[in-house]
UniProtKB/Swiss-Prot annotation:
Enzyme Commission numbers on file: 3.2.2.23, 4.2.99.18
Cofactor mode of binding and number, as noted: Binds 1 zinc ion per subunit.
Swiss-Prot/TrEMBL keywords: DNA damage, DNA repair, DNA-binding, Glycosidase, Hydrolase, Lyase, Metal-binding, Multifunctional enzyme, Zinc, Zinc-finger
CDD domains given in the database record: EcFpg-like_N (cd08966)
Originating organism: Pseudomonas putida (strain W619)
SUPFAM superfamilies reported for this sequence: Glucocorticoid receptor-like (DNA-binding domain), N-terminal domain of MutM-like DNA repair proteins, S13-like H2TH domain
Single Gene Ontology BP annotation: base-excision repair
Family according to the record: Belongs to the FPG family.
Gene Ontology MF, one: damaged DNA binding
InterPro entries: DNA_glyclase/AP_lyase_DNA-bd, DNA_glyclase_Znf_dom_DNA_BS, Formamido-pyr_DNA_Glyclase, FPG_cat, MutM-like_N-ter, Ribosomal_uS13-like_H2TH, Znf_DNA_glyclase/AP_lyase, Znf_FPG/IleRS
Subunit and partners: Monomer.
Record protein name field: Formamidopyrimidine-DNA glycosylase
């Protein structure tokens, strides 16, 4: 599933080619995504100039003169720029055609993504209750410490809660906890302020490094230019259960937390 770095990579790839451009037509070949694509999307967006492309959590916000297209890549989706007129292949559900001669093509084999229209996106029900962005000053270790008091859940699903902080998905939660030396199974409410301060720093560092590398391509993800990400080469623990720890050589273990597999080092993480 594309996580925050992959979505930010997509945003950075498509924004320069969309901003300031006018939409000539929207072609929807299949409306059946997680929620149906609005039947009048072509009418609403065609003829409008795209003002900006922003990201909120794992949602892309394509802001037009009137209204915003809210897009989510789901489990296997991607948005990429192609030349106008390029024939569509299987699973290529939407084309946003631009007067520049390019079009933004949405591909989603599993159809768990979304394309919705809103006149007030930040108050849309999907975005309204989201926590702070992890790479801003609104997120820090003090926030983690305060919100964790009295919480008996494991720390990994705690930091993956979008009400606590957005965009810390399975890959990057696993890596940040390893970097901070915290066992993902530990009770969130039992971790000290000092360790949460360290964890917040590592969350920011890991996410920033992943964005710099263009995200992590494990299976489906490609950026807006059609290229894969390279952060998978930097992974210390995610997907390496049963293999030796890169730092100490201890065999990495796996645990199930919140229906997700979690890999950790029993020696490096306490």
């Amino acid at each position: 599933m594309p996580e925050l770095p992959e979505v930010e990579t997509t945003r950075r790839g498509i924004a320069p080619h969309l901003e300031g451009q006018r939409v000539s037509r929207v072609v929807v070949r299949d409306r059946r995504l997680r929620w149906p694509i609005p039947e009048d999307l072509d009418v609403r967006l065609s003829g409008q100039r795209i003002l900006s492309v922003e990201r909120r959590a794992k949602y892309l916000l394509i802001n037009a003169e009137v209204g915003t297209l809210i897009s989510h890549l789901g489990m296997s989706g991607n948005l990429r720029l192609v030349q106008l007129g390029l024939p569509a292949a299987k699973h290529e559900h939407v084309d946003i055609e631009l007067e520049s001669g390019l079009m933004l093509r949405y591909t989603d084999p599993r159809r768990f993504g979304a394309m919705l229209w809103s006149l007030d996106p930040l108050n849309h029900e999907l975005l309204l209750r989201l926590g702070p962005e992890p790479l801003t000053d609104l997120f820090d270790g003090e926030r983690l410490f305060q919100l964790s008091r009295g919480r008996t859940m494991a720390v990994k699903p705690f930091i993956m809660d979008n009400a606590v902080v957005v965009g810390v998905g399975n890959i990057y939660a696993t890596e940040a906890l390893f970097a901070a030396g915290i066992d993902p199974r530990r009770e969130a409410g039992g971790i000290s302020r000092t360790r949460y301060l360290k964890l917040a720093i590592e969350i920011k560092r890991v996410l920033a490094a992943a964005i710099e590398q263009g995200g992590t391509t494990l299976r489906d993800f490609i950026g807006g230019d059609g290229q894969p990400g390279y952060f998978q080469q930097e992974l210390f623990v995610y997907g390496r259960g049963g293999m030796p720890c890169k730092l100490c050589g201890t065999t990495l273990r796996e645990a199930k937390l919140g229906q997700r597999a979690s890999v950790y080092c029993p020696r490096c993480q306490r």
